[in-house]
Amino acid sequence: MRRKFLCGLAAFAWAPGLWAQPVPARDLWEFPLGSVLEPAALASEPGGGLWNPATTLTSGTERWRLGVAALSSASDQSVDGQLIAATFRRTNGIAFGASIARSAVASILRTETDPQSLGEVPYSSLLMSITAARAIVPHVTAGVALRYREGHADQLVNHAFAADLGIIVHSLPVLDARIAVSSFLWRPGKEIDDRPAVLAAVDARLMGTTDRETRLGLSYNGVNRGAKELGPFVSWRFDRVDLRGAYLRTSASGRSVSRIRWGMALHYARYVVGFAREEGASELGPLYQFTLSSMLR
């Protein structure tokens, strides 16, 4: 079964039809939609494996996970995003996920020689993903994603498929450490046009147990020919409450900016509700996020 699963990963990665034309609005997927409590490479809320397909398989006992997420910025030229996701875990240990995400920028005004506005320029992107993940050896989970992306920029509309691979090494004997790496929006041969990203994170438990712990880690998100983000993060878990803070340094086009991201979540019965705020992302003002997920056995 493990051999079949690895063959499936390779088949997805080299599936025919991945060599479409460039798709506009790629930069909208540099905003961390749904990544409230953990960096993108480790983010398991609200499910579906949007950023790292290996997170489709969770460590819990639930068979179903349903979740939604929303992102918005408080500025005149605002960014907003929505995500709906579902995950199903089979009795043989393989988990499947599906998600639909949309991101857009509003209030881009169309002008000509006259400064008077001629209306708004549409700028948005839709991303649909199907993921699968399973444990391939003890402490190692691998996942694969097949994605369809559509982008709108004024009159230009285009779409393409992409395939991603992700892996998480977890529950290591030393400090319960975790290591996660994933590609994002990868199309072989189109690395310049599509600017795929590499997402990575590592963290370890400083003190406590599973339900009451403090973890410290380092995250990295790097877009090909685009922004590079690096910074430490810390998380606290105390029974039903999660708290997280991160200090991030982003470099792009010869400039660097530092910002703080913080979030919190409440675990109640089979529900998880999360909220996060990020300072000064992409010069669009603060970003606010909300997530809600439900786990069914």
What function would you assign to each model-found segment?
Residues P46, R178-I179, K190-R297:
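Outer membrane beta-barrel transmembrane domains
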Residues T56-R63, R90-A95, A135-H139, H170-D176, ...:
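Short loop/turn motifs that connect adjacent beta-strands in outer-membrane beta-barrel proteins
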